[in-house]
Amino acid sequence: LVIGLAVAIGVTLSSEPLDAGLPEGEVTISGDALPEFAGQNDMDIASGLPAPLFSAPNENSEIVSIEKNGNAKALLFLAHWCGYCQTEVPVIQNLINTVGVPNGVEIIAIATSIDRGRENYPPQKWLSDEGWSETQIYDLNREIGTAYGINAFPYWVFLDKDLNVVVRQTGNIPEE
C-alpha cells in the first residue's frame, strides 16, 4: 500500500508541468548580453555598457518591460531557494517601508533559477509572504539572468536613467 501510494504520488508529481503555479508569459530580450560578472574585487567591465532590454511576466502573468522612462533601475535578481536572498528581501522591503524608494528610481525583483523542488516555491508566494511591494518579474528559463551576466545570488544590477550599467554586485547590500 505504501509503495503503491508513493508510485501514485510520483506519477502525479512527474506529470505536472515544470512551471505549474508560475506566472505565464514569454520572456523577450533585445540588445547585447553583458559579460559574466567577475566579482566585487575586479573592475566591472560592464560599467557604462547599455543593458539588454527585456519583457517578462509579473506575478499576475502581465507582461512588464524594462524601458527608458526617465528612471534609474535597481534590478535585484533572486532565487527563491537562496538563503542570502531570503535574508535580503525583508531587509530591502523594510528599507522601502521605512525610507521609501528615491524619486527617479525603480526597484525590480527578478525571480530566476526557479526550481519547484526547492523551498519557497512558487517564488511569487514567497515574495508576497515577505510583503514585497515593488515590481516582480519572472525569468522562467534564466534568460534574463544570463543576459545580465549573473553568477551568484542575490545579484544587483544598477542602471542609470539611460539604462546603462552603473555597477553590479553580488551578495547582500548593507542596510546602511
Where are these regions (language model features)?
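Structural microenvironment flanking redox-active thiols in thiol-disulfide oxidoreductases
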Residues: 86-130, 140-147
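Thiol/disulfide oxidoreductase modules built on the thioredoxin-like
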Residues: 70-71, 128-133, 139-176
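Short active-site neighborhood of thiol/selenol oxidoreductases, capturing the structured segment around
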Residues: 63-86, 92, 107
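Hydrophobic/aromatic anchor residues within beta-strands of the central parallel beta-sheet
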Residues: 54, 107, 135-136
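A short beta-strand-turn-helix
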Residues: 45-48, 53-74
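Cofactor-binding loop segments of dinucleotide-utilizing enzymes, especially the Rossmann-like FAD-
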Residues: 77-79, 110-112, 161
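N-terminal targeting signals for export/organelle localization
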Residues: 1-51
